[in-house]
Amino acid sequence: MSEIKLIVGLGNPGDKYADTRHNAGEWLIDRLSRRFNFTLKDEAKFFGKTARTVIDGHEIRFLVPATFMNLSGKAIGALASFYRIRPEEILLAHDELDLPPGTVKIKQGGGHGGHNGLKDTIAQLGNNKNFYRLRIGIGHPGDRNLVTSYVLGKPSPADWALIDKALDEAVVCVEILLKDGITKATNRLNGFKA
């Protein structure tokens, strides 16, 4: 396994979207910033907010794209290219319709499953799908015609309580991943349910 060098949190910019399900990846970066005491700063050349810190001897970069979701690959591609970070050294946190609230999973590779942030990231990384995904369950509205309004809506209080617990567990798992590797982090998440 390659060492993770970049952790990305997907979301849409602006206060209007801050509390929407589509910003689950950004919620994780916010928690990681509090846990590891780093501050994101705007960096125009990377089309987003970035930070760098050292965790357990590993230099890690963080990125929250300032672009809308469907263009987030532009930021990821720019930063990865500049620092020569390979796709398999990237952990991308995003909302996942196919997992219920309170669930979080790690996987490597795969398609975009209709997620525009993943779709653009794959394209901007030269069609390389080999990055890791930290999939934060938000549930599904039950009808694909309702997906857009669902991901751009706020979770119910009950769903938020489950997502909140899953985000706390994700922070612990990022620490495990950086210290002990992807397998231990994945195994822990496989046994987790909020």
Curated annotation (Swiss-Prot):
It catalyses: an N-acyl-L-alpha-aminoacyl-tRNA + H2O = an N-acyl-L-amino acid + a tRNA + H(+). The record marks 95 as: Stabilizes the basic form of H active site to accept a proton. The record marks 12 as: Discriminates between blocked and unblocked aminoacyl-tRNA. It comes from the Bacteria. GO terms for cellular component: cytoplasm. The active site is at residue 22. Hydrolyzes ribosome-free peptidyl-tRNAs (with 1 or more amino acids incorporated), which drop off the ribosome during protein synthesis, or as a result of ribosome stalling. Catalyzes the release of premature peptidyl moieties from peptidyl-tRNA molecules trapped in stalled 50S ribosomal subunits, and thus maintains levels of free tRNAs and 50S ribosomes. One of its GO terms (biological process) is protein quality control for misfolded or incompletely synthesized proteins. Monomer. It holds the Pfam family Pept_tRNA_hydro. SUPFAM superfamilies: Peptidyl-tRNA hydrolase-like. GO terms for molecular function: peptidyl-tRNA hydrolase activity; tRNA binding. Keywords: Cytoplasm, Hydrolase, RNA-binding, tRNA-binding. It comes from Actinobacillus succinogenes (strain ATCC 55618 / DSM 22257 / CCUG 43843 / 130Z). Belongs to the PTH family. Disulfide bonds: none annotated. Its main location: cytoplasm. This is Peptidyl-tRNA hydrolase. Its EC number is 3.1.1.29. It is found in: Cytoplasm. TRNA binds at residues 17, 68, 70, 116. InterPro entries: Pept_tRNA_hydro, Pept_tRNA_hydro_CS, Pept_tRNA_hydro_sf.
